[in-house]
Curated annotation (Swiss-Prot):
Single GO molecular function: xenobiotic transmembrane transporter activity
Regions crossing the membrane: 35-55, 73-93, 122-142, 155-175, 184-204, 211-231, 264-284, 293-313, 333-353, 377-397, 412-432, 435-455
Organism, as annotated: Arabidopsis thaliana (Mouse-ear cress)
Membrane topology: Multi-pass membrane protein
PANTHER family per UniProt: MULTIDRUG RESISTANCE PROTEIN
Family: Belongs to the multi antimicrobial extrusion (MATE) (TC 2.A.66.1) family.
Entry protein name: Protein DETOXIFICATION 10
Keywords: Membrane, Transmembrane, Transmembrane helix, Transport
GO biological process, one term: xenobiotic detoxification by transmembrane export across the plasma membrane
Subcellular location: Membrane
Pfam families xrefs: MatE
GO CC annotations, alphabetized: membrane
Amino acid sequence: MQDAERTTNDPVDRIEKVTWRDLQDGSFTAELKRLICFAAPMAAVVIIQFMIQIISMVMVGHLGRLSLASASFAVSFCNVTGFSFIIGLSCALDTLSGQAYGAKLYRKLGVQAYTAMFCLTLVCLPLSLLWFNMGKLIVILGQDPAIAHEAGRYAAWLIPGLFAYAVLQPLIRYFKNQSLITPLLVTSSVVFCIHVPLCWLLVYKSGLGHIGGALALSLSYWLYAIFLGSFMYYSSACSETRAPLTMEIFEGVREFIKYALPSAAMLCLEWWSYELIILLSGLLPNPQLETSVLSICFETLSITYSIPLAIAAAASTRISNELGAGNSRAAHIVVYAAMSLAVMDALMVSMSLLAGRHVFGHVFSSDKKTIEYVAKMAPLVSISIILDSLQGVLSGVASGCGWQHIGAYINFGAFYLWGIPIAASLAFWVHLKGVGLWIGILAGAVLQTLLLALVTGCTNWKTQAREARERMAVAHESELTESELPI
């Protein structure tokens, strides 16, 4: 506690901007190494988490068209109305816990994780009612009754997974904000190894059919949360940051919501814009071809985004830690290092995709028209990969600094006032069809990246560090004065 008091009273360094000369003293190279050591295993974690979802879909897909269509619709619905919102709300911890760790208020990480679990569990209650009645709702909206019925059953069996997600996401950020990536990598790998045979048994051997895919996913999320919770409780690596359950978790609800709502808005506004493009593709002539091609392109973008997402997570953690410690110069250097990694990754991946544009369509489809259309879209997808890498890291910078509200405004303007209107105009009025839709979402991504870069470039890092220190000083005072009554 004395360390924390000394840390929160330490002065903020006087550096407002980092110059080129500052980047040549070894700090930049050292930061690159830190980010790579963080991002490499984190990328593996992201890929494994993605594959857990894919495995369920692949196994369900072998049951037939109705099972695949209903499961795909249910997963898309649940992602938009639930999982995306839970992930977005939990991103508040990227600011709060990251800066608390930098300020050496270690115990706050455990308290904030419990606060997040409590808030997210409450959010799951109305969401679960929505999922339970999904089948009836989408029939009213005009969906095929057979697909709607089976999709509703699939969503209902995903409800336990939603509550698991409310516990899991704060735990993931609890470890990430301490740069403890090994527990995430080990537990996600173990869960994946369990999920594959579990999903196979439930889908093919239990008689549950496609419902088994949803149940397997829910059970795997609970296993993941239990494993991480056990590591948090028993590991000596978490001895300083874990906290007992006290009334203190309720006192942090207001602060959590302050950052959680704009965090959710920032993430969901971008996520939902891509889902809207898929829906618009269904209104085009030959909707089966257009939707299939755009789905393949978005799936490719999701896979290639794993590395930028890991770099963004590393940047967010490092920046929040340094700002919490009052090191404005170090936080600014992290931005340069993270953007350098993002540029290198974007160029390598986009050029590889462009070079193999006549090949990668075969991975997803055997239909000749689909493969040719995917090859035609490849140059646009390559540009999207570059923009996604840059904006992903810039969004990580925003989370580390606590600018989620600015990011939400930017994403709303870039996609809903600019990108999607352009997409609809090009697709339906200029008759560019799927290409027009992608150009529109690309225009939104360009504006989003430029605005995030402008905000980052105009940032006074000394002021950011001072604000973080003031926030942590208030947190430290409350930690010293509040009474900790057991629940």
